[in-house]
C-alpha cells in the first residue's frame, strides 16, 4: 500500500467537457470501460450524479451514483492509475457519499471485486460495511462481488 497523500484536491460536478479525460481513466480502471456515448447517457440521466476530483486543474479521478428511492447505488469510483494507493480513492468516496447525503439519500450501496482489497479498505474507512456476496458477479472472470452498505 502506498503512502497517504496530502495532495490538494477539489471536487465538482462532471461535465460533458470532462468525458475524454474520464474515458482515459476508465480504460485503466475497468475491464468493461465505458465509452464516450455511455458517459454522455449517464450525464443525461436525471437519476445520476457524477463528481470529478481535480488537482492542479487536472482530472485525477471520478465517481458517481444513481439515486433511486432514497438509495444511492455507486456505479463507478476510479482514480488515475499512477495515483492509486495514495488515499485519493478514499477522499473521492467520502466526497461522493457527502453528495449523496446532500441529495437526500438515506443509504449508499456498492459492489466491489472480492480481490480488490484496496478499494474495500477505502470503503471501510468511509464507514461502509460488508453485507454479503454476489457470487460470480463479474462477467470477465466470474469473480464474486462484495456488497457494501453505508447508512445515514
What kind of feature is each model-predicted range?
Residues 80, 84, 111-115, 140:
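Residue-level recognition of the GNAT/N-acetyltransferase active site
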Residues 3-6, 10-82, 86, 93-95, ...:
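Acetyl-CoA-dependent GNAT
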Residues 111, 124, 129-146:
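Conserved catalytic-core motifs of GNAT/GCN5-like acyltransferases
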Residues 11, 85, 111-112, 130:
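Conserved SAM-binding loop
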Residues 74, 108-112:
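Conserved hydrophobic beta-strand within the GNAT/NAT acetyltransferase core sheet
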Amino acid at each position: 500500500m502506498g503512502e497517504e497523500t496530502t495532495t490538494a484536491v477539489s471536487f465538482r460536478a462532471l461535465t460533458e467537457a470532462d468525458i475524454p479525460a474520464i474515458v482515459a481513466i476508465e480504460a485503466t480502471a475497468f475491464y468493461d470501460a465505458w465509452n464516450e456515448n455511455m458517459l454522455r447517457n449517464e450525464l443525461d440521466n436525471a437519476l445520476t450524479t457524477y463528481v470529478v476530483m481535480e488537482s492542479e486543474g487536472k482530472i485525477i479521478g471520478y465517481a458517481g451514483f444513481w439515486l433511486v428511492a432514497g438509495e444511492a447505488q455507486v456505479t463507478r469510483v476510479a482514480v488515475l492509475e499512477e495515483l492509486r494507493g495514495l488515499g485519493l480513492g478514499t477522499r473521492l468516496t467520502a466526497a461522493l457519499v457527502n453528495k449523496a447525503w446532500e441529495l437526500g439519500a438515506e443509504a449508499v450501496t456498492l459492489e466491489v471485486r472480492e480481490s480488490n482489497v484496496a478499494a474495500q479498505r477505502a470503503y471501510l474507512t468511509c464507514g461502509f460495511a460488508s453485507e454479503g456476496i454476489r457470487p460470480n458477479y463479474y462477467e470477465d472472470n466470474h469473480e464474486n462481488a462484495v456488497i457494501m452498505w453505508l447508512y445515514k
